Swiss-Prot record:
The keyword Metal-binding is assigned to this record: yes
Role: Calcium-dependent cell-adhesion protein involved in cells self-recognition and non-self discrimination. Thereby, it is involved in the establishment and maintenance of specific neuronal connections in the brain.
Residues in the signal sequence: 1-29
Membrane topology field: Single-pass type I membrane protein
Family annotation (SMART domains): CA
The protein's name in its UniProt record: Protocadherin beta-8
Glycosylation sites: 419, 437, 568
Subcellular location(s) of the protein: Cell membrane
Extracellular side: 30-691
UniProt record, GO biological process: cell adhesion; homophilic cell adhesion via plasma membrane adhesion molecules; nervous system development
Domain Cadherin: 36-134, 139-243, 248-348, 353-452, 457-562, 569-672
Length: 801
């Protein structure tokens, strides 16, 4: 399932998309060029493909842009979120291209929906990261004393892995009176030093010279390498060795074995004796030539030292030096051309592959791939084919790209999968063949919902956890295949609207891993539960859910807190103990609490310090401080005790409480030191008096205003009472009003009009309405509304209206 998930790109691509692909490929003949300096760190920015392709970010993500290149080595990576093309690793131009210039890495940019691709190339720019190196740190040059000024002596060159300006620029030699050095350039562009005699030598005056040869490259700053040149002045040897021909051209097959004889060169010297003895050697050979060829110093035979590879080097230019015993030498050049053989099988690079494909989608693009062969000529020409009994069609695209399409609609009920073999054959002799097998699956409809392995999950998390902690996982499986079986997980809205689920946990949508987003506190939240949903990616999508319970485990993260005696830094509280107290007398009790639970909240007490050790004791489980023995006159009157309160957690947390005990002979006039905070209390009492006076003044003004308003309202009522139908009874009532004093939670006095209905024959008062309007914020209450008829103390029935 994971393998198919990596290969899934798109499920549908119609023939119209393929036609668009062909058109776009035909118009992309000119590759897009980018450049990067070698040794640039991996993940460095190269370009933004969305801008280069003229795509918006949303369209760029939708079209599934990818970068591919020949072979398995991919030097670039594409950030799908930002469309940035980044280096996949640090590039070394010398490892990638050697002395080839420019160093170009070719790749392709593929787009889908519709299919498009663009050729592109990345040029790796050389930096001066290599110094010139002489393969021979010491050179011996024998110069005849008869050599005239101006005679030149070629020296062995230095090697520099850099190219262009960073390669060797010139040579210099240490100051001397006889020689100078010139920088010469060979046909292949390499530079070598040539020692030129400026002044005739005299062996009798100076038999040898020691000079330092320095090679400088053209970098900034330049790098250099040195070698020692030993010049031996010899007697006259007037003939140098001469080769039979100055230039040799040979051809050799790339599959020639090691020690194979490439060619034999020959030189002669007309001198006699030691001056006529000739030895052969490679001259100014590069590191690659020295590793590939060797020359017999006596016979001049050039043989192979390692296997040739036409794909790396098509030819070699080898310089051979013949030197006699007198120090004179002759040179010749051997051009060795490598003949290609069919030693590389074709390679297939898969760029896009879609499986499974829906059974009801004809002419769907199944795969896009490219073929290549490292050989040349007929050995590099390729043919591509598939089996004939399959409902697929293989079409050639631009360059060496091929597209595999469904030729007819597929029927899953008749066949659920197809094994397709792509056969790639070159035209060499003998022919080499490569096979690529693919399994194309036909997808089914989505008819199975994901099923959790459990209907409910219980997870345990210890409080004070680190954020993003993995607390557990849920898992669901789907019996479908392909995308219909790909399950994504999500958190469903909690049933408790007050539960901040989004800030408590998160879920990995791909694997169902649950993470705590923040540190949990057992004292604030002991447990919570939520539902998790699992949905497949079918169309339409099917889903299921499971219940997850999270139980927070308590940790010992709260130290005991002493409630009594107070330890807030104020004046200490002094406990009085009579000197006549018996052993076991209860002095006081240390009261402490712990915010944790369980054994983390089990508190124990012990006496940590005391003015008189052994005089007092503390009960370990309840914190009671009692006398341990009889008090004596020698015991100090003031005692200071420090009690340690410790919980039972691991590791335990603790707090201390300080007690002040005063031993007195009696309680009639105990000596109590005045608190140090007494002056501050006096200031607080003075402030309280001012506040009370101000509040009383404001209340008096408000009450006076209310009474004035009531008086005006009563005057208006007295005029209107003369035309009413109610008679005014005689009695202790002031005027025609009755004061009904509230006895409940209301503190105001309410006045009602009391009317006795004439001729009714009943002793009923009707309280029509209150004279004063309702004061906002008070109500008469539902009790009075439900029972409006009641009896008063005078035997009348009162009726509220």
């Amino acid at each position: 399932m994971e393998a198919s998930g990596k290969l899934i790109c798109r499920q549908r691509q119609v023939l119209f998309s393929f036609l668009l692909l062909g058109l776009s490929l035909a118009g992309a003949a000119e590759p897009r060029s980018y450049s990067v300096v070698e040794e640039t760190e991996g993940s460095s920015f190269v370009t933004n493909l969305a801008k280069d392709l003229g795509l918006e970010q949303r369209e760029f993500s939708r079209r599934g842009v990818r970068v591919v290149s020949r072979g398995n080595k991919l030097h670039l990576q594409l950030n799908q979120e930002t469309a940035d093309l980044l280096l996949n690793e640090k590039l070394d131009r010398e490892d990638l291209c050697g002395h080839t210039e420019p160093c170009v890495l070719r790749f392709q940019v593929l787009l889908e929906s519709p299919f498009e691709f663009f050729q592109a190339e990345l040029q790796v720019i050389d930096i001066n990261d290599h110094s010139p190196v002489f393969l021979d740190k010491q050179m011996l040059v024998k110069v005849s004393e008869s050599s005239p000024p101006g005679t030149a002596f070629p020296l062995k060159n230095a090697e520099d892995l850099d190219i262009g300006q960073n390669n060797i620029e010139n040579y210099i030699i240490s100051p001397n009176s006889y020689f100078r050095v010139l920088t010469r350039k060979r046909s292949d562009g390499r530079k070598y030093p040539e020692l030129v005699l400026d002044k005739a030598l005299d062996r009798e005056e100076e038999a040898e010279l020691r000079l330092t040869l320095t090679a400088l490259d053209g970098g900034s700053p330049p790098r250099s390498g040195t070698a020692q040149v030993y010049i031996e002045v010899v007697d006259v040897n007037d003939n140098a060795p001469e080769f039979e021909q100055p230039f040799y051209r040979v051809q050799i097959s790339e599959d020639s074995p090691i020690s194979f004889l490439v060619v034999k060169v020959s030189a002669t010297d007309v001198d006699t004796g030691v001056n006529g003895e000739i030895s052969y050697s490679l001259f100014q050979a590069s590191d690659e030539i020295s590793k590939t060829f060797k020359v017999d110093f006596l016979t001049g035979e050039i043989r192979l030292k390692k296997q040739l590879d036409f794909e790396k080097f098509q030819s070699y230019e080898v310089n051979i030096e013949a030197r006699d015993a007198g120090g004179f030498s002759g040179k010749c050049t051997v051009l060795i051309q490598v003949i290609d053989v069919n030693d590389h099988a074709p390679e297939v690079t898969m760029s896009a592959f879609t499986s499974p494909i829906p059974e009801n989608a004809p002419e769907t693009v199944v795969a896009l791939f490219s073929v290549s062969d490292l050989d040349s000529g007929e050995n590099g020409k390729i043919s591509c084919s598939i089996q004939e009994d399959l409902p697929f069609l293989l079409k050639s695209s631009v360059g060496n790209f091929y597209t595999l399409l469904t030729e007819t609609p597929l029927d899953r009920e008749s066949r659920a999968e197809y094994n397709v073999t792509i056969t790639v054959t070159d035209l060499g002799t003998p022919r080499l063949t490569t096979h690529l097998n693919m399994t194309v699956l036909v997808s089914d409809v989505n008819d199975n919902a994901p099923a959790f392995t459990q209907t409910s999950y219980t997870l345990f998390v210890r409080e004070n956890n680190s954020p993003a902690l993995h607390i557990g996982s849920v898992s669901a499986t789907d019996r479908d295949s392909g995308t219909n079986a790909q399950v994504t997980y999500s958190l469903l809205p909690p049933q408790d609207p007050h539960l901040p689920l989004a800030s408590l946990v998160s879920i990995n949508t791909d694997n169902g891993h649950l993470f705590a987003l923040r540190s949990l506190d057992y004292e604030a939240l002991q447990a919570f539960e939520f539902r998790v949903g699992a949905s497949d990616r079918g169309s339409p999508a099917l889903s299921s859910e499971a219940l997850v319970r999270v139980l927070v485990l308590d940790a010992n993260d709260n130290s005991p807190f002493v409630l009594y005696p107070l330890q807030n830094g104020s004046a200490p509280c002094t406990e009085l103990v009579p000197r006549a107290a018996e052993p076991g007398y209860l002095v006081t009790k240390v009261v402490a609490v712990d915010g944790d639970s369980g054994q983390n909240a089990w508190l124990s007490y012990q006496l940590l310090k005391a003015t008189e050790p052994g005089l007092f004791g503390v009960w370990a489980h309840n914190g009671e401080v009692r006398t341990a023995r009889l008090l004596s006159e020698r015991d100090a009157a003031k005692q200071r005790l420090v009690v340690l309160v410790k919980d039972n957690g691991e590791p335990p947390c603790s707090a201390t409480a300080t007690l002040h005990v005063l031993l007195v002979d009696g309680f009639s006039q105990p000596y109590l030191p005045l608190p140090e905070a007494a002056p501050a209390q006096g200031q607080a009492d003075s402030l309280t008096v001012y506040l009370v006076v101000a509040l009383a003044s404001v209340s008096s003004l408000f009450l006076f205003s209310v009474l004035l308003f009531v008086a005006v309202l009563l005057c208006r009522r007295s005029r209107a009472a003369s035309v009413g139908r109610c008679s005014v009874p005689e009695g202790p009532f002031p005027g025609h009003l009755v004061d009904v004093r509230g006895t409940g939670s209301l503190s105001q006095n309410y006045q009602y009009e009391v009317c006795l209905a004439g001729g009714s024959g009943t002793n009923e008062f009707q309280l029509l309405k209150p004279v004063l309007p309702n004061i906002q914020g008070h109500s008469f209450g539902p009790e009075m509304e439900q029972n409006s008829n009641f009896r008063n103390g005078f035997g009348f029935s009162l009726q509220l209206k």
